[in-house]
Amino acid sequence: MRIAMTSGVDGILVESDESDEMSELIDEAVDRGSPVVTLYGDNTHSARCSFVGVGSYNLGREYGRQVLKLAAAEDTEDPLKVAVLMNAHALNSAQNIVCSGIQDALEQEKLQESEIQMSLIIVDDTNTFSVEESIRDIFMDQTLPDIIICLNELSTTCVYQAVVDYNCVGEIAILGYYDTDTILKAIERNVITATISIDTEQMGAFCVDALQEYYNYGYTSQYFTADVTVIDQSNVEEYLGKQEEAE
């Protein structure tokens, strides 16, 4: 942000959070004449002109629907244990909204009487190593969840690796986030059950649109919401093919 402001750029796209420091930086950039669009993470207390991201509540409902699909396929009367991994240092409310969406979907769209127990597990996201350690602690516990929901790419990759390392493939269903090559191949191997893919090309276009509208009219939409898609065994080959073409 400092480099962008010093350079006097015409606009700034930044992956933000709700920290006071980020609010001050965004406000300073706007005061200097550089409109700011927040991306992925928002800063609602700043003078940013727009936010481009995903609808956290709808994202949560989609995770909830995937849990219900897995519950319907289970042939057991035991409660289904679902763990949602939450970042300890995420300074925004998006995670809480996702969890609300999951809970609402489980309560409103449940078709059978299967009991689903949802718990939140706090992950130390100080760095990659701390995330890995937090997730490995889950697998050291004697009572493992039946389903783990990951709200970011790093958690998804770390849970996938832990499931393999602790020989839990087929015992724990992973609902991930994002569509890296590693995650897609894990779905192909049936280690990760499904992941949520964001239309990043659409997000980029929204960012440009927001800045252009702001320069042309002096204002723009406060929010742009990108499309999300569930990737699972039924369509993973299509996405792997797209990545191979891109390479």
Model-derived segments and spans:
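Short, solvent-exposed amphipathic alpha-helices that sit
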Residues: L59-Y63, S93-S114, S130, S134, ...
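Hydrophobic alpha-helical segments within soluble ligand-binding/sensing domains
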Residues: V52-L80, I97, F129-E132, D179-I183, ...
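Structural detector of well-ordered beta-strand residues that form the stable sheet scaffold
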Residues: V37, A173-L175, I231
